[in-house]
């Protein structure tokens, strides 16, 4: 049996506490962390190709009101509906554009909010 196979057999017989201690000792001995995924080491070689999937994995989005357009009243109504703000707060947000209307929401919620604002005549950006 090879050394690697022997090590695997030993690891199979270890408890969770022993495995935790092994991980910590391994990190201290070799100056590495177990949290770093292998794919990160390959990222610099992939260059821009690896950057594109990272952007697609984004889970939180901001809806930014860039310009309220000509129909501010309709935009204020939509902002109130989306945020639950009072009339004055919603008006201040619309008048102070560009400002975030919703922050850290899912892609579906961000797209739905952006669509409502666009229907009201606003210029919107989802980041």
Swiss-Prot record:
Record NCBIfam families: L12
Question: Is the keyword Ribonucleoprotein assigned to this protein?
Answer: yes
The similarity comment for this entry is: Belongs to the bacterial ribosomal protein bL12 family.
Swiss-Prot/TrEMBL GO biological process terms? translation
Leader sequence range is none
Task: Name the gene behind this protein.
Answer: rplL
Protein name according to UniProt: Large ribosomal subunit protein bL12
Which Pfam families does the protein's record reference? Ribosomal_L12 (PF00542), Ribosomal_L12_N (PF16320)
Task: Give Gene Ontology CC terms.
Answer: cytosolic large ribosomal subunit
Q: Which organism is it from?
A: Symbiobacterium thermophilum (strain DSM 24528 / JCM 14929 / IAM 14863 / T)
| Quaternary context | Homodimer. Part of the ribosomal stalk of the 50S ribosomal subunit. Forms a multimeric L10(L12)X complex, where L10 forms an elongated spine to which 2 to 4 L12 dimers bind in a sequential fashion. Binds GTP-bound translation factors.
